[in-house]
Amino acid sequence: MSAAPTSGPLTCRRAGPLRGAIEVPGDKSISHRSLLFGALSTGETRVAGLLDAEDVHSTRRAVEALGATVRTEGAEVVVTPPATLREPGDVIDCGNSGTSLRLLTGVLSGVPGLSVLTGDASLRRRPVRRVIDPLRVMGANLSARDGDRLPPVVVRGGALRGARHLLPVASAQVKSALLLAGLFAEGETTVVEPEKSRDHTERMLRGMGVPVKVSGLEVSVSAARPAGGRVDVPGDISSAAFFLCGAAALPGSEVTVRNLGVNETRTGLLDVLRAMGADVRLANLREVAGEPRADVTVRADRLEGTEIRGATIPRLIDELPVVMVMATQARGRTVIRDAKELRVKESDRLAAMGETLSRAGARIELFEDGCAIDGPTPLRGVEVRTRLDHRIAMSMAVAQLFCGGEPVVLDDVACVATSFPSFFRLLDQVSGQASGGGAP
């Protein structure tokens, strides 16, 4: 069996069960922030476990354009900040990374000069108004395409003033963009969320010496520069989800993911797995550099449908596509609500997964903010349009495990490199394949 291609179509033809112990690459959210916060700091930042994937490369190129130096020393990446961030000499291309674009919009709002942020075709279809509008309240001078709705974003950096922001939807990216702008603003900046989103920004800034006030759903900062320091990036639970969900639903499976980040704002998946009846165990639980981590084992069991809504949604928003796959194998109905955010990711993930799983034989009803899935349902092989969305591609590679040996054909797997270049190799490893999972 040949190695999986890095671009173009791929035929997935694997069989379970999934068994073994693996480590997934470093957390993407923490990796982005490590580079960006390092560039804002007064001293050097050393990062262990940085994710080596295209999205993070976009952030690296961006901070280098702003004057930071980023170099590799052995297993660490070292960020040396400039005395002050400089105006970039060219357009900053964020590739497929919405995190890069939104967080940089916040930072550059307070950096004197002109900056232009753009990205690939997928990123240029993702909304930016919900970042632009609250930043304008702080005095930011911003404009964007299509009536300020879509990238590219033009930033004319200048003086900012603190403000109190009430977010209509919990979003770690919007929250982080506003807090980062607050580091350049006069007065206090406060962000209030309807539910708690991932809190890596708060933890990391505090770990770098920035006074961060957290009270319930409120987070506040004032003007400050981080001091830099050391960041140890745990494994990404959003990447581990493909293996954990596959193992939970595929009879005879047991998978352990070592050194996995288990920050409580990210562990909605573990709660859902338990609610559905999976055997979930955590071992070697510890905290390193302010982030909890553990070795997480999931063993297959008979799954039952459940309801996923409300405050759980921000804690597993990126994992929902593969949760939808898992739900097709659970007895009864699984209902997902309050997940409208899925419609403005790299693709409309609700529509994409709903249409693709339906063609594969799933019984699924779509709502504006979620779906209902009835199971268990044997799936069949299907051709998949990945829509340049890494999570659609990887979720449907997992779905193929439930297709009774029939292949799933992904039209283009280049998108997987944005977050998880080693995905197919690790899936081969736990499924007992030689390599690649491609057509024989």
Curated annotation (Swiss-Prot):
<feature type="active site" description="Proton acceptor">
    <location>
        <position position="318"/>
    </location>
</feature>
<comment type="pathway">
    <text>Metabolic intermediate biosynthesis; chorismate biosynthesis; chorismate from D-erythrose 4-phosphate and phosphoenolpyruvate: step 6/7.</text>
</comment>
<keyword id="KW-0028">Amino-acid biosynthesis</keyword>
<feature type="binding site">
    <location>
        <position position="98"/>
    </location>
    <ligand>
        <name>phosphoenolpyruvate</name>
    </ligand>
</feature>
<feature type="binding site">
    <location>
        <position position="33"/>
    </location>
    <ligand>
        <name>3-phosphoshikimate</name>
    </ligand>
</feature>
<keyword id="KW-0057">Aromatic amino acid biosynthesis</keyword>
<dbReference type="InterPro" id="IPR023193">
    <property type="entry name" value="EPSP_synthase_CS"/>
</dbReference>
<feature type="binding site">
    <location>
        <position position="173"/>
    </location>
    <ligand>
        <name>phosphoenolpyruvate</name>
    </ligand>
</feature>
<feature type="binding site">
    <location>
        <position position="29"/>
    </location>
    <ligand>
        <name>3-phosphoshikimate</name>
    </ligand>
</feature>
<feature type="binding site">
    <location>
        <position position="171"/>
    </location>
    <ligand>
        <name>3-phosphoshikimate</name>
    </ligand>
</feature>
<dbReference type="GO" id="GO:0008652">
    <property type="term" value="P:amino acid biosynthetic process"/>
</dbReference>
<feature type="binding site">
    <location>
        <position position="318"/>
    </location>
    <ligand>
        <name>3-phosphoshikimate</name>
    </ligand>
</feature>
<feature type="binding site">
    <location>
        <position position="345"/>
    </location>
    <ligand>
        <name>3-phosphoshikimate</name>
    </ligand>
</feature>
<feature type="binding site">
    <location>
        <position position="28"/>
    </location>
    <ligand>
        <name>phosphoenolpyruvate</name>
    </ligand>
</feature>
<comment type="function">
    <text>Catalyzes the transfer of the enolpyruvyl moiety of phosphoenolpyruvate (PEP) to the 5-hydroxyl of shikimate-3-phosphate (S3P) to produce enolpyruvyl shikimate-3-phosphate and inorganic phosphate.</text>
</comment>
<dbReference type="InterPro" id="IPR036968">
    <property type="entry name" value="Enolpyruvate_Tfrase_sf"/>
</dbReference>
<feature type="binding site">
    <location>
        <position position="126"/>
    </location>
    <ligand>
        <name>phosphoenolpyruvate</name>
    </ligand>
</feature>
<dbReference type="InterPro" id="IPR001986">
    <property type="entry name" value="Enolpyruvate_Tfrase_dom"/>
</dbReference>
<protein>
    <recommendedName>
        <fullName>3-phosphoshikimate 1-carboxyvinyltransferase</fullName>
        <ecNumber>2.5.1.19</ecNumber>
    </recommendedName>
</protein>
<keyword id="KW-0963">Cytoplasm</keyword>
<feature type="binding site">
    <location>
        <position position="28"/>
    </location>
    <ligand>
        <name>3-phosphoshikimate</name>
    </ligand>
</feature>
<dbReference type="InterPro" id="IPR006264">
    <property type="entry name" value="EPSP_synthase"/>
</dbReference>
<comment type="similarity">
    <text>Belongs to the EPSP synthase family.</text>
</comment>
<dbReference type="GO" id="GO:0009423">
    <property type="term" value="P:chorismate biosynthetic process"/>
</dbReference>
<feature type="binding site">
    <location>
        <position position="349"/>
    </location>
    <ligand>
        <name>phosphoenolpyruvate</name>
    </ligand>
</feature>
<comment type="subunit">
    <text>Monomer.</text>
</comment>
<feature type="binding site">
    <location>
        <position position="173"/>
    </location>
    <ligand>
        <name>3-phosphoshikimate</name>
    </ligand>
</feature>
<dbReference type="GO" id="GO:0005737">
    <property type="term" value="C:cytoplasm"/>
</dbReference>
<dbReference type="Pfam" id="PF00275">
    <property type="entry name" value="EPSP_synthase"/>
</dbReference>
<dbReference type="InterPro" id="IPR013792">
    <property type="entry name" value="RNA3'P_cycl/enolpyr_Trfase_a/b"/>
</dbReference>
<dbReference type="GO" id="GO:0003866">
    <property type="term" value="F:3-phosphoshikimate 1-carboxyvinyltransferase activity"/>
</dbReference>
<keyword id="KW-0808">Transferase</keyword>
<feature type="binding site">
    <location>
        <position position="391"/>
    </location>
    <ligand>
        <name>phosphoenolpyruvate</name>
    </ligand>
</feature>
<dbReference type="GO" id="GO:0009073">
    <property type="term" value="P:aromatic amino acid family biosynthetic process"/>
</dbReference>
